[in-house]
Amino acid sequence: MPSLSLSKLLRVGEGRMVKRLKHIADHVSSLSPEVEDLTDEQLRAKTEEFRARYRDGETLDELLPEAFAVAREASWRVIDQRHFHVQIMGGAALHFGNIAEMKTGEGKTLTCVLPAYLNAIAGDGVHVVTVNDYLAKRDSEWMGRVHRFLGLDTSVILSGMSPAERRAAYAADITYGTNNEFGFDYLRDNMTHSLDDLVQRGHSFAVVDEVDSILIDEARTPLIISGPADASSKWYAEFARIAPLLKRDVHYEVDIRKRTIGVHEAGVELVEDQLGIDNLYEAANSPLVSYLNNAIKAKELYTKDKDYIVREGEVIIVDEFTGRVLVGRRYNEGMHQAIEAKEKVEIKAENQTLATITLQNYFRLYDKLSGMTGTAETEAAELHQIYNLGVIPIPTNRPMVRVDNGDLIYKTEEAKFDAVVDDVVERHEKGQPVLIGTTSVERSEYLSKQFTKRGVAHNVLNAKFHEQEAQIIAEAGRSGAVTVATNMAGRGTDVVLGGNPDIIADIALRKQGLDPVHTPDDYEAAWDDVLDQVKAEVKADADKVREAGGLYVLGTERHESRRIDNQLRGRSGRQGDPGESRFYLSLGDELMRRFNGAALESIMTRLNLPDDVPIEAKMVSKAIKSAQTQVEQQNFEIRKNVLKYDEVMNQQRTVIYNERRQILEGKDMEGQVEKMITDVVTAYVDGATAEGYVEDWDLEQLWTALKTLYPVGVDYKELVGDGDGETNDITADELRETLLTDAHDAYARREAEIDGVAGAGSMRELERRVLLSVLDRKWREHLYEMDYLKEGIGLRAMAQRDPLVEYQREGFDMFGGMLEGLKEESVGFLFNLQVEAAAPQAAQAPGVSVTAASAAATAAASPAPAAPRPLPTQEAAQQAQGTAAPSALRAKGLDDGEPRGLTYSGPAEDGNAQLSRRGAAESDDAADAGTRRQRREAARSQSKGKKAPRTKRKR
């Protein structure tokens, strides 16, 4: 973790920045009387006025006071919420590219309206990033009402949307979405085969809500797009049969803290007996080891109804951090298949990586980045170091009066939950609303059953019921309400005492068939009357709740991060309301088992305390803080390590994606190919003439290799002699120049041939398709090899070598080899692919269609010029090019130029689990895909993923 002194050092000058923000807020407030006098039409016309002034040279900083005043007034007129002074400060902090640290309940979503409106004036697009689809859609509708009133377009990116819908959403002035969706769209844009298929239009300005969750917690898990692997395997079910026969601490050991397993010799022997093999670790059987490890992990580390649920024959991951089911998302590296085998459901295909990027490197693409959170101070150093973001604490609108009670710790979980139920029943009887935070679906359902037995009316908010989330939250602050939530952190919803009037009013209007997006006029016309009616209903109840002590937040377990605990507590005591919080813990809690649990248990045993008598001591708080700090340190190290290794890939990815974009745009295609021909022929000649004199060179082998590359028009026998035993003096340079001239002449003839068959300019289109196809395939193969390299690079430490340095060095060599192979295969395809005119009904400008030439003509050459290999086979050529006249060129694994059957793997909201989402185009056919080793071998042999508006944020 960053040291406290470093954090303090980075926050030097904060006071001056806060004073500056106060002056800006004062200036904006002073403009209110002038703006209030404007009619709706005049207020709306301000947007075009600001755009004209921006085009004439005024900066956004100069427009800020007026633009903020206009957006503030529009918010008041449309949603009955006016930005407080501190929210204006927060908006200015965001515009200047900082993180605004605003406590829970201070109205971060409303604050975001100000910088989003201002920066949308520039016309480059504003991205508002949230933690889940629910919040993205809700905020785009809720705050979109304000932006639409001012003449701006708003849209939302949701999982499952088509490319056309995404393109339209990115064309809007302000686009809402999750970090995963924005990142996946960036990766997909760098997999497309046409400029028309691009969806994003640049990375100008982003506001990240819950910035600590997205940029810190989730940053240790990269975004990965993968597709079905080539090979297949049936071993998952076999090892799912064997796993129950293995006994913990006899056949294997488990480290819960590190979430790893280790197989003992006895376990290996049992597996060998079951499979009828002599040695599990010999080369032929080594792929089975990963199946064994995954089967044991599925048994010990992945629990049904906690980490996943089984619904309609499908294993669906549960984000334990938020309690949401993540439909379509899957674990990587065969883990999901192992769980499917364990649960005896259909086993879906394993995948190979097609594209990947870390969140750190994605968000660093933005020209200006900002964020909002209630808890960023402890991560100030990391945010500054990685993203160059300063953290500015924004004062609260009203003083906090919530009472945070000390933790109560019990010996057993059963005793803890009994005490929780007793506490809740007592508070329910006096009319105090209670919000209970649990860490899993299983625990929330257990508590629900206990409350039902005691006759306590309650609502459950977890992965199985989140469809009713808005209504449950809207009523969670009512007198006597009891709400069990799998986890509230990251939900971005306030629990308002007496009930949330905004959400209740919205639900009422939706029941009448009104909607802020599809029926905006009718919705806005009815809004004020319904809202006033609801406010009157909830006001009296809110007074009763305040008398009862406000919202009581009860946590049933501490989380890995103190920040998450604080977010749960922050649901109570918003905007100066009374409130209370307490955490109930037990020695059986996961955090206590992972760290320091045994020491506490021995103390409680020595004190001879009954199970139902808790202790409340500073020692407990210190132990918990120590455990949480250790987890935070571990996660920080993981994030740093991910970033170090991804920096190597990021440099390579930047080169490939820039090259790919140039090919898409058709920039100087002819010049690129001519240079490739020069490089490839030069490499062949240099390899063949590296040693000795002309009589020592194996020119026959060189010519054989060159003929598989292009139709050679000169005879080496004529160059070196007439065959009578004497050789002419010819230097390597002269030989090279002769062959280069011949190759370029051959390419000119090839271009004339192609243009004659398919029309003028067809050669450029063929070049574009071939280069894209080969580039994509070589990049995928390179990702395979880099992934494999990273898996084993840690062993270099045993040889006293720095694994990172070794990874950088070997990764650079592999990248260079990949680029050489790319040139060679591209030249071979361009010379040897058979081209014919496309059928008129399916013509694609400029009418190029490609079919394979003969196998001999399409054989591939080796990257090592001294020992040439055949060029790509006909099968490989067909994979690279497409097959029929109307088809675009496509690489292996792609269909008509478009990837299909994709899986999208990224971080959960806690950043802890690697998850994936199957693409809509994926076939439902179940197929086992092979191990990573099998896939690599196969690759070499072939050439080798509308909810209610946000609660009212009037502060």
Curated annotation (Swiss-Prot):
The protein's enzyme class:
translocase
Q: Which domain of life is it from?
A: Bacteria
Q: Which CDD domains match?
A: DEXDc_SecA, SF2_C_secA
Molecular function terms in GO for this entry?
Answer: ATP binding; protein-exporting ATPase activity
Q: Show the catalytic activity.
A: ATP + H2O + cellular proteinSide 1 = ADP + phosphate + cellular proteinSide 2
Q: What is its EC number?
A: 7.4.2.8
Where is it located?
Answer: Cell membrane; Cytoplasm
Q: Where is this region: Disordered?
A: 861-955
Q: Do the record's keywords include Phosphoprotein?
A: no
- Is the keyword Protein transport assigned to this protein? yes
The residues listed in the UniProt record as binding ATP, with positions renumbered to this chain, are 87, 105-109, 494
The biased composition feature labelled Basic residues covers 943-955
Q: Its GO CC terms?
A: cell envelope Sec protein transport complex; cytosol; plasma membrane
Subunit structure of this entry?
Monomer and homodimer. Part of the essential Sec protein translocation apparatus which comprises SecA, SecYEG and auxiliary proteins SecDF. Other proteins may also be involved.
Task: Give the family from UniProt.
Answer: Belongs to the SecA family.
Q: Which HAMAP family match?
A: SecA
Q: What is the annotated role of this protein in its UniProt record?
A: Part of the Sec protein translocase complex. Interacts with the SecYEG preprotein conducting channel. Has a central role in coupling the hydrolysis of ATP to the transfer of proteins into and across the cell membrane, serving as an ATP-driven molecular motor driving the stepwise translocation of polypeptide chains across the membrane.
The record ties this protein, via PANTHER family, to:
CHLOROPLAST PROTEIN-TRANSPORTING ATPASE (PTHR30612:SF0), SECA INNER MEMBRANE COMPONENT OF SEC PROTEIN SECRETION SYSTEM (PTHR30612)
Q: What is the designated name of this protein?
A: Protein translocase subunit SecA
Q: Which organism is it from?
A: Rhodococcus jostii (strain RHA1)
